[in-house]
A protein has these predicted regions:
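Zinc-dependent deaminase catalytic domain
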Residues: 12, 20-183
Length: 183
């Protein structure tokens, strides 16, 4: 109390104004102490939430996927799945993989995967993703896993499973840490 009072009085304000300021500060401090503590998300949760927002840009009719590369707590690039630049999007022409089981026949799909788009953005802008962490809404497929390995990504954090155990095996064999976060 005395320290606050001394600080306010050092501004040489009118004594009545000083008293009002002191009372205001003390009541705000008491109010803050009574507030419930704020639960701050961990970094994996924080960056995964951003990947979820990135996925909302997707035009895929089957799955909206988002990805981002992070290094030293800084976002390097983002990507979402969709048709290559200049081509019609799936939400306009329809899904080429309609009726095809999930995790199979990737070659039929014209879309670029979220992870691939994030890598392309890094390459286009001269950003190294070596040693970075990939946050993606879905587990990477085998094609994207091979790209992560060659790009020397350090860690992959994903939310939703994808029916491609080989991709996970490849990542682990390459020494890339793989973490699935809970919803």
């Amino acid at each position: 109390r005395n320290r606050c009072k001394e600080e306010i009085l050092s501004f040489r304000c009118h004594p009545l104004r000083a008293r009002s300021l002191i009372e205001s500060l003390l009541s705000k401090r008491a109010a803050i102490q009574l507030m419930p503590s704020i639960e701050r998300p961990g970094l994996d949760e924080y960056f995964m939430e951003i990947a979820i927002v990135v996925a909302k840009r997707s035009t895929c009719l089957r799955n909206q996927m988002g990805a981002l590369f992070v290094k030293n707590k800084r976002i390097l690039t983002t990507g979402y799945n969709g048709a290559p630049a200049g081509l019609e999007h799936c939400d306009v022409v329809g899904c080429a993989r309609e009726g095809v089981p999930s995790g199979t026949r990737h070659e039929l799909c014209p879309a670029v995967h979220a992870e691939q788009n994030a890598i392309i953005q890094a390459a286009m802008h001269g950003i190294s993703i070596e040693g970075a962490t990939l946050y993606c809404t879905h587990q990477p497929c085998i094609l994207c896993a091979k790209m992560m390995i060659n790009a020397r990504v350090a860690k992959v954090v994903y939310l939703h499973c994808y029916p491609d155990q080989t991709a996970l095996d490849f990542l682990e064999q390459a020494g890339i840490e793989v973490v699935r976060v809970e919803e």
